[in-house]
Amino acid sequence: MPLTVRVITPDKTVWDGDVQEAILPSTSGQLGILAGHAPLLTALDTGVIRVRPDKEWKSIAVMGGFAEVELDEIKVLVNSAEAGDAIDKEAAKAEYDAAQSRLEEASKGGEPREQMKAANAYKRARARLQAAGGLV
């Protein structure tokens, strides 16, 4: 019996389909969901949702949000999400490199606010690059 996964942003549905398994980036760590999972509501961190509709895994970059698991259905509500196959890997790599440099620079004595902004930009860039298949 498959799980139905829906990844929804305010302006579009990024994923809507049946999967055998899903892995969510919850704020307390990676969370694996199979059919028959107990009901659950969890906050999501910026990261990558991985779904397995058949033998191949698919990746979706998400920028935080919430996930609800109930009756073999996972509803993911996020402000921003991108399917990994829709992300330009080269552009994502350039964004990741720039964010990494900015984070290193901010860590060398920048203001706490700048350090936090750089860390958040790095997490977003890393999630996008991972979803595109450029980072393991």
Curated annotation (Swiss-Prot):
It comes from Crocosphaera subtropica (strain ATCC 51142 / BH68). HAMAP family: ATP_synth_epsil_bac (MF_00530). Residues 98-116 have a biased composition (Basic and acidic residues). It is a peripheral membrane protein. Belongs to the ATPase epsilon chain family. InterPro entries: ATP_synth_F1_dsu/esu (IPR001469), ATP_synth_F1_dsu/esu_N (IPR020546), ATP_synth_F1_esu_C (IPR020547), ATPsynth_dsu/esu_N (IPR036771). Residues 98-120 are annotated as: Disordered. The keyword Ion transport applies. Keywords: ATP synthesis, CF(1), Hydrogen ion transport, Ion transport, Membrane, Thylakoid, Transport. This is ATP synthase epsilon chain. F-type ATPases have 2 components, CF(1) - the catalytic core - and CF(0) - the membrane proton channel. CF(1) has five subunits: alpha(3), beta(3), gamma(1), delta(1), epsilon(1). CF(0) has three main subunits: a, b and c. The gene is atpC. One of its GO terms (molecular function) is proton-transporting ATP synthase activity, rotational mechanism. It is found in: Cellular thylakoid membrane. Pfam families: ATP-synt_DE, ATP-synt_DE_N. Produces ATP from ADP in the presence of a proton gradient across the membrane. It comes from the Bacteria. GO terms for cellular component: plasma membrane-derived thylakoid membrane; proton-transporting ATP synthase complex.
